[in-house]
Design a protein with these regions (language model features):
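Active-site acidic/histidine proton-transfer and metal-coordination neighborhood
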Residues: 79-181
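Short, flexible, mixed-charge acidic loops at enzyme active sites
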Residues: 19-24, 108-118, 219-231
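Acidic/histidine-rich catalytic cores of soluble enzymes
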Residues: 41, 134-245, 295-298
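Non-cysteine beta-strand/loop elements that form the S-adenosyl-L-methionine
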Residues: 4-8, 66, 101-106, 204-215, ...
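N-terminal pre-domain/capping segments
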Residues: 1-100, 123, 127-128, 134-135, ...
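Active-site beta-loop-alpha junctions enriched in small/polar residues
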Residues: 10-12, 44-46, 70-74, 106-108, ...
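C-terminal/domain-terminus segments
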Residues: 261-290
Length: 298
């Protein structure tokens, strides 16, 4: 088993709401990631776009790139348009030494809309859209394989693949050799799903993991007040492992049992003015150190 522990930059700066953490520099974020003891990170909007420059900054801090988010529009735009953007994204990540590409379908998504409930207004794909999505994801998987990489699909609040039933459908419709799965604890729990059920069902397809925790009071408010995803983030519905309602110990035990090989990335979209990113990075690291034993790094 080969695992590395990383942390996403969204606790420092938020790509969907640039005002959150606008004062935080790229250098501050990666300095604090390294100081907190993480081995790598995912790519944020403030990161240098030149792989040579980015690698220089990260090498100084002994950090690596685990992956980066890619927004696909396979249900709403011509495939060729998404593929062209994907190849550029793929080549950047390949130059950075990443092995997986995080893909999430944004066709009809409400995750970036302030006035749309993440539950009431989430999209539901038609049969034709499901087929387009599945076929097109397999084609992107082929493009990833050209450079020895693979895509990992990110189930996400406010999108057409949010629930267990929707994850099941996507997995059933796609070739396991071409489409892998990203396992995100926070999005599953917030959606009302059981993370262990998903992990046990798809452990052989899970090639990337996000450890995100959920605050119970804010999670309930997300439903009862019909809040949008972005409103929920500002309200503090997400936090780091060890600070919310999720017990990560049985999840870690399941990960060990199945000999998972890859990155575990700590994530928590929060307002850095309310939740100091460095303090929360340390909080997560200290908590995970009490339940996890990582044999060696990727």
């Amino acid at each position: 088993m080969t695992i590395a522990l990383g942390i996403a930059p969204i606790g420092w700066t938020n790509d969907d709401m640039p005002d959150l953490g606008k004062e935080v520099t790229f250098e501050q974020a990666i300095d604090e990631m390294a100081l907190a003891g993480y081995q790598g990170t995912e790519v944020g909007n403030k990161y240098p776009k030149d792989p040579v420059v980015l690698k220089h900054y990260l090498d100084l801090r002994h950090l690596k790139i685990a992956s980066a988010w890619f927004s696909a529009f396979l249900t709403t735009k011509p495939y060729e348009e998404t593929e062209a953007a994907f190849i550029k994204h793929r080549d950047f990540l390949h130059a950075m030494g990443a092995k997986v590409i995080v893909v999430a379908e944004q066709g009809h998504s409400v995750q970036g809309m302030l006035d749309k409930s993440v539950f009431d207004d989430k999209p539901h794909f038609t049969d034709e859209e499901w087929q387009r999505l599945a076929t097109s994801l397999e084609r992107l998987g082929d493009r990833a394989h050209e450079v020895g990489m693979q895509i990992v699909y990110h189930h996400h609040m406010g999108t057409g693949v949010q629930t267990t039933a929707e994850i099941d459908k996507l997995m059933a419709m796609t070739d396991p050799d071409k489409v892998s799965l990203l396992f995100d604890t926070g999005h599953l729990v917030l959606s009302g799903e059981d993370p262990l059920t998903i992990f046990d069902r798809y452990h052989d397809r899970i090639k990337h993991i996000h450890f995100k925790d959920v605050r119970p009071e804010q999670a309930q408010q997300e439903r009862t007040d019909h809040l949008s995803f972005l409103q929920g983030v500002k309200n503090g519905m997400f936090t780091v492992p060890g600070d919310g309602m999720i017990d990560f110990k049985p999840i870690w035990e399941a990960i060990q049992k199945q000999h998972y090989d890859g990155w575990i990335v700590v994530e928590a979209e929060q307002d850095p003015a309310k939740a100091n990113p460095f303090e929360y990075a340390l909080k997560a690291k200290h908590y995970l150190d009490t339940i996890m034993t990582i044999p060696h790094a990727v």
